[in-house]
Regions:
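N-proximal low-complexity "stem/linker" segments adjacent to membrane-targeting elements
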Residues: 1-34
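Catalytic donor/gating beta->alpha subdomain of glycosyltransferases that bind UDP-sugars
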Residues: 173-233
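Membrane-embedded multi-pass helical conduit in multi-pass membrane proteins
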Residues: 235-316
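Glycine-rich, basic loop-to-helix element that forms the pyrophosphate-binding segment
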Residues: 78-96, 114-118
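Short beta-strand/loop segment that forms part of the nucleotide-sugar
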Residues: 41-52, 77-79
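Short aromatic/hydrophobic "clamp" motif used to bind/position activated sugar donors
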Residues: 101
Length: 320
């Protein structure tokens, strides 16, 4: 009775990403159902199956076959093909109807279960986005990416490694108003104009955490796309390269003028050919810098449709 009285009278959603995570499903389901049942009167679980090839979905059905379902709803989104974590989690968030939405990017548990309550209680202090992050075992390339991103991003919110997060309904609505296409959730969440915070923790098992982190090829593409979308790094790089070649062209022009003034014997036609090429390439590189600037502006203004396809949504209903 006391437990029921201590529950929050709110409906929350928990969105979980699935891609060959069968090894972690049983432990995760036991933890998440216990914690959410202790915290809230009603909740829903949304599993986004991103073309898993293992028996993870069967394990989910088996778990709820032997679990009493009196305060939760369970949905499984079947993606039509493998589409990556960002697109899959966008699909799950769009389906969620809770007052608060938890997002779990993977099912591996390397944090104390009390952290779920802790990040929720942080939202009660006025924060609309609260994430749980861990820097233990972070690769050098990840550190470099976050450093470059935060240094070159024009926004105040800084990003870092995150394991899971909670969003208020106001944050979800704000994100939807920003645009239909969310290429990198972490950057959007931390810079949507609402109060955001990160609670850091230390991993229970660093080696196991490193093994559980997957999708390195996908993360590489995501990192490059994010630098293009949210920072001016690529614009700066292209400008530096163009400026370098402009300088080389100018030096070549100076050399041509020097040889002409000193009347140095040269191969017939060499001066005119090199002079034309120097001026031409200098013009090309200047134009490329201007084009890159225009492309950067167009990219920020362009409206993109949501990019994910689902095959269907399955519901796990309680037994009658």
């Amino acid at each position: 009775m006391d437990l029921a009285q201590n529950r929050e009278h709110k409906f929350v959603s928990a969105v979980m990403y699935l891609h060959n995570d069968a090894a972690y499903i049983d432990m995760f389901l036991s933890m998440i159902t216990q914690e959410l049942a202790a915290l809230f009167d009603k909740y829903e679980l949304i599993f986004v199956n991103d073309a898993s090839s293992d028996d993870g979905i069967a394990k989910i059905y088996d778990f709820f076959e032997h679990t009493k379902m009196d305060s939760q709803m369970v949905s499984i989104i079947q993606m039509s093909s493998y589409q990556g974590q960002e697109a899959a989690m966008n699909a799950g968030r769009d389906l969620a109807i809770g007052d608060f939405v938890f997002e779990f990017d993977n099912l591996f548990i390397d944090y104390p279960k009390t952290l779920i309550r802790k990040i929720y209680e942080r939202t009660l202090e006025g924060y609309d986005v609260v994430a749980a992050g861990c820097r233990d075992g972070m690769r050098f390339t990840s550190r470099m990416f976050y450093s470059v991103f935060n240094r070159n991003s024009n926004s105040e919110g800084k990003i870092g490694p995150e394991t899971f997060r909670i969003l208020s309904r106001r944050a979800v609505n704000r994100i939807k108003s920003i645009g239909d296409y969310i290429p990198y959730r972490k950057a959007i969440y931390m810079n949507c104009g609402l109060r955001a915070d990160v609670i850091e923790y230390h991993a229970i098992d660093i080696d196991a955490r490193r093994k559980a982190l997957k999708g390195r090829h996908e993360r590489t593409h995501l990192a490059l796309d994010s630098l293009i979308y949210f920072t001016d790094v690529m614009e700066k790089v292209s400008t530096v390269i163009s400026a370098l070649f402009v300088v080389i062209s100018l030096l070549m022009g100076i050399e041509i003028i020097r040889e002409f003034c000193m009347k140095t014997q040269a191969v017939s036609g060499w001066l005119s050919t090199m002079g034309f090429m120097s001026l031409s390439f200098m013009g090309v590189f200047i134009l490329l810098s201007i084009i890159m600037k225009y492309l950067s502006v167009i990219l920020k203004l362009m409206y993109r449709k949501q990019r994910y396809l689902i095959a269907g949504v399955e519901k796990i209903a309680p037994k009658q």
